[in-house]
Amino acid sequence: MTLIFGLLKAVVSILLAIINILGIQINTTKVELYENPASGYKWEYSFDQSGIITLNETHYTPDTDSILSGKGGGTRYFTFRALDSGNVRVTFEYVKYTDNQRIVASDYIYTYIVDDFGGITLQSIE
């Protein structure tokens, strides 16, 4: 039974590698955070370890009200995809750079579990 599970895990790892090389979105998770580029702040992210998930895409969509008012608020979307199984913490910091200083206005830590089949599960948000 252990041998079969080991072989299955190896096959899944190979398939995930092929999927990643081809850029096919299969096992992804999305994070949506409020952002106001007019304020000078933007979201930055970092992983506590590499090789578990990677950024697949990010884009910003302004709110309809902010377009009309010119205040610039909207939503920043981050889509991550699985690379390998394991646990990973993604830290998001809402930062602004001014006068050689890095100012962090807000931060969140998302903890994910990626299973042996590439499924991504959000475990917690701090």
What is the predicted role of each segment?
Residues 12-23:
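Hydrophobic alpha-helical targeting segments used for export or membrane insertion
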